[in-house]
Amino acid sequence: MKTLEYIDQSLFFFINQTCSTKLLNTLMPFITNQKNWAIPIVALIFILMIKSGKRGRITLGVLIICIGMTDFISAQLIKPWIGRIRPSHEILDQINLLVNKGGKWSFPSNHAANTMALTVVISYFYEKYKPILILLTFLIGISRIYVGVHYPFDIIGGFAVGYIFAWGTITLWVMLKMRELKRGRDWVWYN
C-alpha cells in the first residue's frame, strides 16, 4: 500500500509542479472549471434533442440516467465511504493550487467519473466522436491533478466508476431495446 501511495504522490508532484508552465497555469484552470463547459453542454443537449432525431433523444435519455447515477453514487456514497482527503486539504503548503480547494473528499474524482460516463455513452451511439471525447476526458482528468485538487489514482478511480456505470446503463438500454423489439414496439429503433 505504501508503494501505491508513493507512486500516486510522485505522479501528483510531477504533474502539479514539474510540468508547471505559465501557459498550463492558465489553460488547466480553464479546462477544469465546469462553468466553462455550460455552453458546450447546452449545445450538446440541443443537438441531441432537436437535430439528431430519435437516436439523439435516446442518447440524451441514457446519458441523463447514467450521469445522474454516476454522480450521485460517486459523490454521495463512494467518496465519504473511502474518505480520502484531497491534496488541496492535506498538503496545501506543498502544492501548486490554481483553483479553490474543493470539497474534503477526493476519491473518486466526479469530474473524471462524469466525463468518462459521457464519453462511453456518446461513443456507443456516435462512434465517430470517440477520439475527441477520449481526448477531452483525458484533458479534464489531467487538469484536476494539475490544478492541485486530485491525486492521479482519484482520476483513475473516477474513470473506472464512470466506465462501469456507463456500460451498465448501456447494457440495461440494450436489454430494454431487445425486449421492446420482440414485442413489436418500434419506439426504440433508430437509424
Regions found by a protein language model. Give the residues of each.
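Membrane-helix interface segments
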Residues: 23, 54-59, 126-132
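Alpha-helical transmembrane segments
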Residues: 34-37, 60, 64, 116, ...
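Hydrophobic, aromatic-rich transmembrane alpha-helices
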Residues: 40-51, 115-123
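Interfacial segments of alpha-helical transmembrane regions
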Residues: 42-73
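Helix-loop junctions at the membrane-solvent interface of multi-pass transporters
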Residues: 51, 81, 173-176
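Alpha-helical transmembrane segments of multipass membrane proteins
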Residues: 66, 70-75, 162-170
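Membrane-embedded catalytic cores of phosphoryl/pyrophosphoryl-handling enzymes
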Residues: 95-191
